[in-house]
């Protein structure tokens, strides 16, 4: 019988080609310039505003030993706080897109604010004690000056900003899958059938079948090793039938011969007492496999 490509169980042919692995390609995002100067300007602006709001606290406290009541005064700290606020405003303006940067002026104002604040702290009147707000404002102004100076050094190139880490697209495009390679025999048939696209040197010149003994058919249908022209599979050959035997052989090999091949024996006929002439006769030979019996005369010797 013949299997056509439409029948169930027929394997689907796979495309031939070279097998390629998956090659994911990740798209690099634009690194751009370092954002460290922008972060430093933000720090300058925030610290200047924090120093300004902290200056509303008790900077100096009037001592009670002089007979005065407890009171909080600002002393000479107004100027350093004003300078720090100006530096914060200039740094904030530089954050606006396409705005001119005044990083040099901001750095100068930051350092100037630190010097003025230190001078006001140590030159306080003897009747006043230092309040908690003075130390907070001094800390904010010092950190503001440090950030302003770092921004100036990065802007001028004295300090190299760290290179930003390369960013990859999390949804990168993947390469195309290659086709499956050729492994000698093309798919499309049963039991080692060769494909139609196989090289001519590897194809079989004709059907090759193992020799079968004469008179016996193959138990299984033979399969042709050459590809069919339609490419639909193998055609099974019906088993050969054994030749018919002659009538004479069938008559000799009838029911007298069991399946084992040994001759069958039947019991001898009973001898009656009244027949004296046959009492001394020899027994009949029943071992003839051909089934014929030879007659013997009464009293004669067996043949």
UniProtKB/Swiss-Prot annotation:
Pro residues: which segments have biased composition? 256-271
How does the protein's chain sit in the membrane according to the entry? Answer: Multi-pass membrane protein
Low complexity composition-biased segments: 194-207, 215-255, 287-303
Alphabetically ordered keywords of this record: Acetylation, Cell membrane, Membrane, Transmembrane, Transmembrane helix
GO cellular component, as recorded: peptidoglycan-based cell wall; plasma membrane
Q: Which InterPro entries match?
A: DUF5336
Q: Membrane-crossing residues? A: 42-62, 77-97, 102-122, 134-154
Where N-acetylthreonine occurs, residue numbers?
2
Q: Subcellular localization, per the record?
A: Cell membrane
Q: Where is the composition biased (Polar residues)?
A: 274-286
Positions of region (Disordered) = 194-303
| A Pfam family assignment | DUF5336
Say which family it is in: To M.paratuberculosis 34 kDa antigenic protein.
Designated name of the protein? 34 kDa antigenic protein homolog
Organism of provenance: Mycobacterium tuberculosis (strain ATCC 25618 / H37Rv)
